């Protein structure tokens, strides 16, 4: 390897020399002075200046002179041997190198290696080696040793060569950095390596990273002093790139978001960072998948930050996105669309926020259910049914809607796109872009059956007892796939979103609560507990708390239903709970038919309430907008919150409870009064 590297370095140096007459020729002159004397050719030459000019060699017919400018005209003839001079350079550096220390000389070879390898980048590691050489150069520059360093300068030449041997640039960059790096210490070399490292990862994801590495190189010479800055950039890209690729691990996205965002995100501010990450992640990773994961990742980030702030509930949303991501991916990011509604609600939702949320959730639940059979209405209908009695009481009805959103949230959200199809689909499809379209086209079709399969994911609920779920199922199950299957229903779904069913009961006002839970969960908490109250009903009920109070339990069941885990815990509740989940899978499939009727009624019911439901309809539109918003998908997280309830874990013990605790618990009491 070393021989090869040396030869490559020599070639690069020879090619690069012409461009760098000042550095290399000066060094070469010194080298000639030192080396030529033995040959005797050097001393006779009175015009070293010309040589320094570099033209002297060319003008001179002397083959020796023409050989490597290194004094070793004879050896110079052996251009390769010229490298030996580099080898000597190490020795030469030895003196100067000794200053840095001989260690550098060994690196010296690396430099050559790096130059070529640098290009390779894998040798990128050599770049670190070069850094030492780089130091050699610096050191060499300081002292005549330069002749040997001269070769290192060639390293810089590589920059010149960079044009050609871009790789050298990397090497040089390290060298350049090395100088500064050397000053600080090898530490800089690490930066150099980072580029290389990035190069590998960067190359993997895209060579883009290597470019960064090179950029540092370019900077290295001039930038070397500042280079550190460049290195960071270089690393960030690499980091993002690699992480981005990993992004899959939404977490990395988070991490990346900080990094990537750090630069970009930081620019905007944290809030922006989430978006920032999405772009970054999406850009590299996003492009790759553009994995809904990134969106989820970003959502988590965005939600996480905001959501986390509001309460952990948001984190659940984050997970929901992930969960949805899988399921969502299946159905499609459709969830984001609904998410968008929440998203809008989440960020914007918080602003309105409940108003939008209701629509948002309705869209999710309704969209999904409505879309599916339009069982969506059923979801509301079913939840309302159960809630209806209790729902009327508290208007848990809204909470049920909330649950529906949950189920829908993950899958429902995805489904919603179908409903949107008429209005939102364009947006969602566009917003989701290819991803959604991919899934959507199939979903709209008979997929409903498949949709139920998605509900299958709801399996948890299904596990509880699909039987009851059937009614409920339509909502949840339908939500996921259902929505996809028959967009036509979705329109009704929107009316349902009108959760109107429940909304009508209380009137939409309650629906807002329902949605608030979702939206509120993340933003809802932020915006105001008011929404949470409703939210709490679902959450509270979702948790066991609802169970405790029988009265609430009825609503609770709906929430429990939402709370997949809750449903699991107690079959009784599960039935309702199942309705959303369980039904989702099996229930949705079979019951959907009935649900459709149910939904229609719900829709109609909402119609009466529709006046208010009217907002829900907007809600669906928001979903459409959400598509764009969907990208923010954070919205999904909002649904996520409902999902959180659904989120087996989240809902099961903590998340579900946490939401209630945050604002829900207090809101919970209020909700009772509000309904009344």
From Swiss-Prot:
One of its GO terms (molecular function) is hormone activity. The modification Phosphoserine is found at residues 28, 30. Coiled coil: none annotated. Keywords: Hormone, Phosphoprotein, Repeat, Secreted, Signal. Residues 36-50, 71-424, 442-676 have a biased composition (Pro residues). One of its GO terms (cellular component) is extracellular region. Acinar cells and secretory granules of the parotid gland. It comes from the Eukaryota. The keyword Transmembrane does not apply. It is found in: Secreted. Residues 29-676 are annotated as: Disordered. Residues 1-16 form the signal peptide. The parotid hormone stimulates dentinal fluid transport in teeth. This is Basic proline-rich protein. The lineage of its organism: Eukaryota, Metazoa, Chordata, Craniata, Vertebrata.
